């Protein structure tokens, strides 16, 4: 019995230790990226900024092979730009003239499947360059078809304009295909976006990404930590070349810098689990740089709210009253506007432009974003908005569970101590019983006739 109770105690203690480990992992999670994904989830997929790599030059720098391709996807890369061609000697399509396109696409499919049930499931855009002879069209379709389970056709995107959450969660699709060559586009048919559907420039060529609000604006060049986020902020989707990094670790760091365009450095601040002080978000405007970033803020502060036009994503105003976060509602904004948060880099750029013209001094404004319901889970809306990532109990219920578990642990510990220290009467009488049985056996032996 004591051993059984000890096992129960160990299981309980192990649960507590696992909770600590999970909490440590949460501390390491890219909370800024997850919250940004939630914010951008209602934007049409072909208007979402992406961070990608040019595979051929990247293979030259960090090495080629399927493991390298998988590692790139694990860093958070969302766009794979690849030069492809049909190799007569190999009898199939090749990627960068060195590896099988079919094998590369299979690697992409496996990596998507591995990340499918996780928080980091994301969109992957395959951008294909090269020429295709009609005789090899079917082989190309077969190669791209290896990721067909996850592919959403360009034809459907154009017809329905699905937002990111719909594509990832409702449709359970992850892949879009872009063909930058007319012959590739013809080979893939309605599956792929054509060269007329996107803007794509290389090297020192220039592009005004803000003019292409209904499609991706890719810019391929050498990027560094100091400039890559600026391109994203302007609405561009950077394609990082191999000259930008020396290894996978540097690529991962550069991708992370590029992906988070919203929060300021060191934000959102990690607060005490029992504190609700820094669980609301504000937008801070720096007049010197004319830049705005998000920051975690005490929900009890009185600030004006940032308002977005109901029918125009790029029209913004500042409310006239200073309010606490829990006081925000439709009445906090002028007619035709609502409390909101910039959901894309271009929306935030319009906020900066508006503030520079109408509120040119440094300022701080509420945005409709908070983590009041669940710590570290930043969601768009008011204090009662639930966390979309995981189903969690409230802080009060969680505290009640901890108290109950602690009491059970204490009771089990007391029982184990009692069983070890207090003798049971049957155990105390065991020697007496042995003596009685011994005497009886001896008497019975002595009574046997000779």
UniProtKB/Swiss-Prot annotation:
It comes from the Eukaryota. It is a single-pass type I membrane protein. GO terms for biological process: cellular response to hydrostatic pressure. Coiled coil: none annotated. Its main location: membrane. The chain crosses the membrane at residues 398-418. Residues 19-397 are extracellular. Residues 1-18 form the signal peptide. Glycans are attached at residues 204, 247. Keywords: Glycoprotein, Membrane, Signal, Transmembrane, Transmembrane helix. It holds the Pfam family TIM-barrel_MTC6. Residues 419-450 are cytoplasmic. GO terms for cellular component: endoplasmic reticulum membrane. It is found in: Membrane. May be involved in telomere capping. Belongs to the MTC6 family. This is Maintenance of telomere capping protein 6.
